[in-house]
């Protein structure tokens, strides 16, 4: 999947559905405002699963955020948006413009002004030996105002092999 442009999900827009990316899958040279390669959303009306077992996500751009993957759970529960990565490569994807350009692999987000411990967020599950370069951003528009500081979670399975340290960065508000 290459050379596409969109507001959300330059290569793939996934809404309340599941997709599996296997060895040989290539998503490159796509552009969007959010989710240069992939934009995926789960809600309480329907869950979403992005499962990456292989393939390459590279050379994608996002004007705002999530050049590789932008995953959001909108007013759902904890299990409504999962990103599972066990293989493949996510590298050389860039968000922003000019001097604000940065390598950004994944943005995980929740969107619900009524935060509780059951509030849904896009959560990341890591296992195997994927290559991920650039930042992984945990974001939420409502967390800063809430003293409980709920946020997206990253689950790391004991089979996860770190090829290179992954930069985790929070964004609130």
Predicted regions and their residues:
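Surface-exposed loop/turn motifs in large extracellular/passenger domains
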Residues: 2-5, 12-31, 39-61, 69-95, ...
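Glycine- and aromatic-rich loop/turn segments at beta-sheet edges
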Residues: 97-98, 102-103
């Amino acid at each position: 999947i290459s050379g596409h442009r969109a507001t959300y999900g330059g290569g793939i827009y996934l809404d309340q559905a599941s997709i599996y990316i296997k060895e040989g899958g290539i998503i490159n040279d796509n552009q969007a405002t959010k989710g240069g390669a992939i934009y995926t959303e789960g809600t309480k009306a329907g869950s979403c699963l992005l499962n990456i077992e292989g393939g390459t996500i590279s050379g994608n751009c996002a004007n705002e955020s999530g050049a590789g993957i932008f995953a959001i759970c909108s007013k759902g529960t904890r299990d409504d948006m999962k990103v599972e990565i066990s293989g493949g490569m996510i590298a050389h994807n860039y968000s922003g413009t000019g001097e604000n350009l940065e390598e950004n692999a994944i943005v995980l987000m929740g969107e619900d002004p009524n935060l509780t411990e059951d509030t849904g967020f896009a959560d990341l599950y890591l296992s195997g030996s994927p290559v991920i370069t650039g930042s992984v951003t945990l974001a939420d528009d409502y967390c800063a105002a809430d003293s409980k500081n709920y946020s997206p979670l990253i689950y790391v399975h004991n089979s996860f092999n770190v090829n290179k340290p992954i930069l985790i960065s929070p964004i609130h508000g």
